[in-house]
Amino acid sequence: MDFDSSNLSLDCLIYIFSFLDEDDLIRASEVCKFWHEAAVTPWLWRQMCLQQWTFCNVARSESGKGSWRSYFLRRARLERRMETGRSGADYTCRSLRGHTGSVVGLVYLAGSDADISSSASVVCSASTDGTVRAWDVQQGTQLWATPAQSALCDITVDTKLGTLFTSDTAGKISAWEGLSGREVASFSTSSSGCKLLAYSVENQSVLMAGTGGGALHTLTSPSLTQLSRHMLFDTFKINQLISSPDRKWLFVGAQECIDTSPKVFFSESLSCPSEDEPPLRQSLPVSDCCAAAFLPADPARLVLIHNTENRGYSTLSVFNISMKKSKYQVDILVQQVETFQLEFGGRRPDVLLQTQGSDTLVVAVGNRLRVYTLKGVVLASFEDHTQPIAALCVDSFRVVTASRDLSLRVLTWKKEKDKGRTLQSRFHLLGGSHTMSRGFTKVACDYVSIVASVQSVNGKDVLKAYSFNS
């Protein structure tokens, strides 16, 4: 007996369609007008979006006029292209040239995320040629360049204010307007090679600057007025400045000072200093720290890779950071909650550490990439490169490794019933000729693009921009 769907109500048909995947749902919408009405129901596509992705903001897509259906189809199509990585069909590669020195850092001034389909990606790069340059990633064009000054050492961005900050070898910190590249403020530290970190705490934007002499400056953003200065590592360079995702905690370390413990600060005590009391800080019970990262979904947890006293092997330790209040004072409490030994032996200053979620750790050393749980269980291991991994970029969708072998490797997260979150290696992105370059040195990503710096043989580094087609 033939089935007559006209006997079904619209609600019944929508319920039946809720068991279909996107391809079947699209085919069902083409059967007849009644089926089309059911198949394009926003509730169906909203459910599919929320099952596929943790967070969706359809109101931000397509200037706020998008539907759940168009949102799902666009995002799913883009992610399929980011998984297959076919040159020309899935992405466009452009070379960004203009620097006459080495690229020391690159940051996204404006990036595209999963909810915005039409916004342009703008990357800014700093170089030893003394300039900052802004690039349109999709068009492959330079938007502006600052006048040359002393060789630059570092760059960071306050995306909320649209302001860039750089430090140079003469000890000068500069603030640049993101739209024009105009210098809006400067501050002299009298110390070369400052490490920079911009962030907002309690609705106040600040810039942290760690100097080559071991001092930590807290400056207002973007005016660069000094709020506080503290000497932390006498004569040793501060080269680790990391803020927790909720901006409550600040990690400060000096890799060269192997016998001194890194520090963790209560951020508000630096940005809103008290005349009567020193900032709240605590030394961590480790030394010779090679890498550090907070957990995105558990911002009070800090992960450190450090060397043991006998320097025989490296250890990964996880600490919980909290406030301990008594009647007369407030202290920072640091508690070790996990620790395990890593497979590589000896001191490895080249180790890279990134985190994802509340319990996933990504560690790169040499040409090897490994994914761990907080308990030290290895979820995945890769050796896709023939030379060391120089830089690492991790987000909720993928991991990108940049290697001295002049290739990028793209890996995507995958959920498995038995293992939970794991990583799947996808494809290589090549960087050009080995005769003209010495490999990739840095990498940055937004949702629709990847930008990496190539160290050139002639000293004029080039950026490679990979823009995925939506």
Residue ranges of each PLM-predicted region?
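Intrinsically disordered, low-complexity acidic/Ser/Thr/Pro-rich linker and tail segments
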Residues: 1-6, 10-18, 23-141, 324-343, ...
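Inter-blade linker and blade-boundary elements of WD-repeat/beta-propeller domains
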Residues: 56, 77-98, 141-154, 182-198, ...
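WD40-repeat beta-propellers
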Residues: 106, 132-136, 173-177, 216-220, ...
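Loop/turn segments within WD40 beta-propeller blades
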Residues: 107-120, 156-161, 198-205, 242-248, ...
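Conserved beta-strand element within WD40/beta-propeller blades
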Residues: 115-117, 123-127, 164-168, 207-210, ...
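A generic tandem-repeat structural signature
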Residues: 133-223, 227
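C-terminal interaction modules of eukaryotic adaptor/scaffold proteins
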Residues: 387, 391-392, 398-470
